[in-house]
């Protein structure tokens, strides 16, 4: 009896403590701590080692296809992507599919993320970013090839595929739980990583540009942000509710425009600062193995340079997460390996071209970089404005808005596929698009920092079931690749 009394008393004291200290605050701190620990794992060294390891394994097993067949990749992607071709019902053209995938991967990280990697890891981080992209090309090739090979038609007659389908159809029912986990993590990711954080970037870019030119005052920003959120929500709804055809049509117009727009201006920075270019290349290669010369670091700086470069390459092109393969699965093609070539091209365009040009803007412009301190888009903006003048801030705002909007569209498609797979019902897609569009308004007006951080963690967790599937299905990738090139050789 006395034991029961003591237990009851202790429980009462504990409850009183929670009330006094604030149960909500304690729970919030606990969630934050747990989320941070998991986030550090899935976006940290263990995850990077796994992703790089899978990319290396696939590269070895395919004979480093991404290097050996790179001329063929260019021939079958850039060489054919502008040919006019109508897709069959329920599908996109291969070009529309790669543009939709690029819409999801080419985002604000290409501007802000690269700047952060250079600021912390030094110029040598660019070299390690290239290395990770080289292996990521083969990872993305495998993801796309498997997605097209194991895809299926939904009730609406549309092609659906991606990691959850190549797990389901490639590994069998005993691995079904991995497909469910992948889709669940995906649904918990799309509203934060794919939507709200992107809208927040759009709002911040517009606010900064308008304040700089005194178009509006600080007092009007809350109203302006609401208007921007509503406009973005309406545009997102118009695109997504138009179905797979409209998503593909918008992507094939928006992505090439924004990429070319950014590339031309970035190349201009390099050309106008051409005398610095050889020195920048020297800094990249020398800094890869001796970053202390630039960052002022000591023993740990080489590891930091590698970590920042590799992580930026992985996080930018999403090789290992499997998301881009969902868009590629919509392509009107009968040859999985040929669509896989677009996966290689996707990583090349995202990381080798766009991320590298961002690095060149920062390093060639001659701006002062405070190595060892965190930085973001402001470093890239400074590189443009130093070369072109103050008007370049407007250009950067436009680029950020385009990159962010395209990401919202791409992740909207991914989210609909995740939810339909979980619910075994395509009727949830349109209501999802409505809710997803509405989140754009919240992203523009409400600070939900912890929720978006949790979404980022779930985004990282998506890599675990996908990497397991890639390992188990690597033999299928090798066989499909051998059969494809044997057929190509036989047909001349």
Where are these regions (language model features)?
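Transmembrane helix-loop junctions in multi-pass membrane proteins
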Residues: 28-31, 61-66, 109-114, 192-202, ...
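N-terminal alpha-helical transmembrane segments of multi-pass membrane transport
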Residues: 14, 18-108, 118-125, 136, ...
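Membrane-interface loop-to-helix entry segments
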Residues: 50, 54-57, 61-74, 199-206, ...
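Membrane-embedded translocation segments of transport machinery
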Residues: 242-245, 249-252, 257-324, 329, ...
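Flexible loop linkers connecting adjacent transmembrane helices
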Residues: 64-92, 116-126, 130, 138-173, ...
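Extracellular/periplasmic helix-exit of transmembrane alpha-helices
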Residues: 143-155, 267-283, 294-297, 330-333, ...
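Helix-loop-helix module between adjacent transmembrane segments
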Residues: 58-59, 132-157, 164, 168-200, ...
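Alpha-helical membrane segments and immediately flanking helix-loop junctions
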Residues: 85-120, 146-170, 181-187, 299-348
């Amino acid at each position: 009896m006395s034991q029961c009394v003591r237990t009851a008393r202790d429980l009462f004291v504990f409850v009183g403590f929670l009330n006094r200290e604030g149960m909500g605050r304690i729970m919030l701190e606990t969630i934050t701590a747990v989320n941070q620990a998991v986030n550090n794992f899935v976006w940290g060294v263990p995850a990077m080692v796994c992703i790089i390891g899978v990319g290396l394994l696939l590269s070895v097993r395919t004979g480093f296809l991404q290097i050996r067949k790179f001329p063929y990749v260019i021939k079958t992607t850039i060489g054919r992507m502008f040919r006019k071709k109508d897709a069959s019902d329920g599908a996109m053209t291969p070009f529309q599919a790669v543009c939709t995938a690029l819409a999801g991967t080419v985002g604000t990280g290409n501007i802000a993320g690269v700047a952060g990697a250079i600021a912390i890891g030094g110029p040598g981080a660019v070299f390690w970013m290239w290395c990770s992209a080289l292996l990521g090309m083969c990872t993305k090739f495998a993801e796309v090839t498997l997605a097209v090979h194991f895809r299926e038609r939904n009730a609406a007659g549309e092609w659906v595929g991606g990691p959850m389908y190549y797990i389901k159809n490639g590994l069998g029912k005993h691995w079904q739980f991995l497909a469910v986990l992948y889709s669940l993590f995906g649904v918990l990711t799309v509203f934060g990583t794919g939507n709200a954080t992107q809208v927040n970037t759009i709002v911040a870019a517009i606010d900064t540009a308008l304040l700089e030119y005194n178009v509006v005052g600080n007092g009007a920003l809350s109203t302006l942000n609401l208007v921007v959120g509503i406009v973005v929500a309406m545009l997102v709804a118009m695109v997504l509710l138009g179905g797979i055809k409209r998503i593909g049509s918008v992507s094939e117009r928006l992505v090439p425009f924004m990429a070319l727009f950014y590339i031309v201006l970035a190349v201009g920075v390099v050309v106008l600062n051409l005398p610095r270019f050889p020195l920048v290349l020297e800094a990249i290669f020398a800094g890869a193995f001796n970053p202390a010369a630039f960052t002022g670091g000591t023993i740990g700086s080489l590891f930091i340079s590698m970590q920042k470069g590799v992580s930026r390459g992985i996080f930018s092109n999403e090789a290992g997460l499997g998301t881009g393969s969902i868009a590629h699965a919509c392509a009107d093609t009968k040859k999985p390996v040929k669509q896989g070539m677009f996966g290689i091209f996707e990583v090349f365009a995202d990381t080798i071209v766009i991320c590298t040009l961002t690095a060149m803007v920062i390093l060639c412009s001659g701006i002062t970089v405070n190595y060892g301190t965190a930085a973001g888009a402001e470093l890239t903006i400074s590189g443009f404005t130093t070369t072109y003048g103050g008007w370049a801030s407007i250009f950067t705002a436009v680029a950020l808005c385009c990159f962010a909007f395209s990401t919202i569209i791409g992740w909207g498609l991914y989210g609909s596929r995740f939810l339909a797979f979980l619910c075994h019902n395509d009727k949830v897609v349109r209501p999802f698009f409505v809710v997803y569009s509405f989140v754009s308004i919240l992203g523009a007006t409400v600070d939900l920092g912890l929720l978006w951080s949790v979404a980022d963690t779930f985004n990282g967790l998506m890599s675990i079931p996908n990497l397991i599937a890639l390992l188990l299905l690597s033999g299928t990738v090798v066989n499909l690749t051998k059969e494809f090139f044997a057929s190509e050789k036989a047909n001349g």
